[in-house]
Amino acid sequence: MSRTDDIVELGHLCASYALRMTRGDITYVIENLMTADGTYSAFGEVYSLQDWPALVEAAPRGLFLCGDPELHLDGDTATGQVPLLFVDQTNHRMRMGWYSDTYRRTDAGWRLATRSMSFLRRSGDVDAGNPHDPRRPTPTGTPGEP
């Protein structure tokens, strides 16, 4: 595969994530876009894939609008950052920030290994987010693991 092919595939992966999260299709995200040991970090905590269905259930629904990823390729691994604008479907309030990702090439193609969220605040600060629902799961991910 060429570098250009890798960049196109990783861009498609990021776009698929945004569309599937907008549609609420977390099963597709887990089974087709993440590595089996993948994690998601938000609120200063690391969530494993087994936590994701409950985490998504506790989260607001809405539009995940992502820009093109900035990618750094290194053989069968890569890192990247993806701008995100989230629009809550109930009140159209927006949240903005970016994902910081690690990617791994698998037999099935490129997959997300880790994804962490950074939120931009009106004050100019950046943070990992405010927990939005006390029903969110207790995280079972391990910091630093892909």
What is the meaning of each model-derived region?
Residues 79, 96-130:
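Short beta-strand edge/turn micro-motifs at domain boundaries
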